Amino acid sequence: MKKYIIALLIFSSSIAQAQQTPRQIGEYDDWVVYTYKENNHNVCYMASTPKRDEGKYTKRGDIYIVITHRPGEKSFDVFNVVAGYDYKKDSKVTAKIGKEIFSNFFTDKDKAWTMSETDDRALIKAMMRGERMIIEGQSARGTKTKDTYSLKGFTRAYKTINAKCGKK
């Protein structure tokens, strides 16, 4: 059920026109893969929710990460975190995979993205090698959070979105 909610949340937060409802095309351990049509082009994405979320918060929305391919826009490997709260202005978001730390993110409300395609590719490469990823952030109220994601099934899910959306 939680995975279905992710599909609906991602779909409802998209602002593109002429979309279909996302269709699940695979589930690989802790990762789920979806596709839909947007302006007559395939969009493929994979999503996961944290295995553990930590922080001294009283209320928090849905938390998940997404990797998206939009071949119609020549956009691939877009990494996105949805924190379940609005980020504090100018706060730092970090992703840690093993000993590698990625901190080149920008935020907008409850979402964070890497700063560049190069950062996306480096992060995804590390995710393919890793076992887990820890995302740390700070809410607009100053609450620090730490979310732990499993990377089990990540590589198979990633290969699926690559094949479905024509990324070589």
Predicted regions, residues:
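Positively charged n-region of N-terminal signal peptides that target proteins for export
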Residues: 1-4, 31
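...the same signal can extend to comparable exposed beta-sheet modules
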Residues: 1, 16-18
